[in-house]
Amino acid sequence: MSNQVLCCVVLCLLGANTVDGGITQSPKYLFRKEGQNVTLSCEQNLNHDAMYWYRQDPGQGLRLIYYSQIVNDFQKGDIAEGYSVSREKKESFPLTVTSAQKNPTAFYLCASSI
């Protein structure tokens, strides 16, 4: 491999890791005991007004749990039962999975938009 090509590959890979803004969801993995409430964190530094929480069960598509267009206001999505949210800051939209939620395996996704 020539030095020019190697240099380009290294610079491209370094550039791919540079991010000015983003959305962070935590924890990455979570195991919950039956009857236990747990809270998933969602933080964004993109200055987006709208934030969303989705759930995906194995073999299914994404389903909207809750969404928020502005601070201190949020609406239920298609499957809000067994969940609660708050939106005290523009940057944050935590989701609490309550003990009423029975299905043990799911993928949760937080998103934001302008």
From Swiss-Prot:
Cysteine pairs bridged by disulfides in the record: C42-C110
Signal peptide boundaries: 1-21
Compartments, as annotated in UniProt: Cell membrane
Residues with glycosylation annotation: N37
GO biological processes: adaptive immune response; cell surface receptor signaling pathway
The species this protein was found in: Homo sapiens
Pfam families noted in UniProt: V-set (PF07686)
Keywords, alphabetical: Adaptive immunity, Cell membrane, Disulfide bond, Glycoprotein, Immunity, Immunoglobulin domain, Membrane, Receptor, Signal, T cell receptor
Domain named Ig-like: residues: 22-114
Top-rank taxon: Eukaryota
Function: V region of the variable domain of T cell receptor (TR) beta chain that participates in the antigen recognition. Alpha-beta T cell receptors are antigen specific receptors which are essential to the immune response and are present on the cell surface of T lymphocytes. Recognize peptide-major histocompatibility (MH) (pMH) complexes that are displayed by antigen presenting cells (APC), a prerequisite for efficient T cell adaptive immunity against pathogens.
Gene Ontology annotations for the cellular component aspect, listed alphabetically: alpha-beta T cell receptor complex; plasma membrane
Record-given protein name: T cell receptor beta variable 19
Subunit structure, interactors included: Alpha-beta TR is a heterodimer composed of an alpha and beta chain; disulfide-linked. The alpha-beta TR is associated with the transmembrane signaling CD3 coreceptor proteins to form the TR-CD3 (TcR or TCR). The assembly of alpha-beta TR heterodimers with CD3 occurs in the endoplasmic reticulum where a single alpha-beta TR heterodimer associates with one CD3D-CD3E heterodimer, one CD3G-CD3E heterodimer and one CD247 homodimer forming a stable octameric structure. CD3D-CD3E and CD3G-CD3E heterodimers preferentially associate with TR alpha and TR beta chains, respectively. (Microbial infection) Interacts with Staphylococcus aureus enterotoxin type B/SEB.
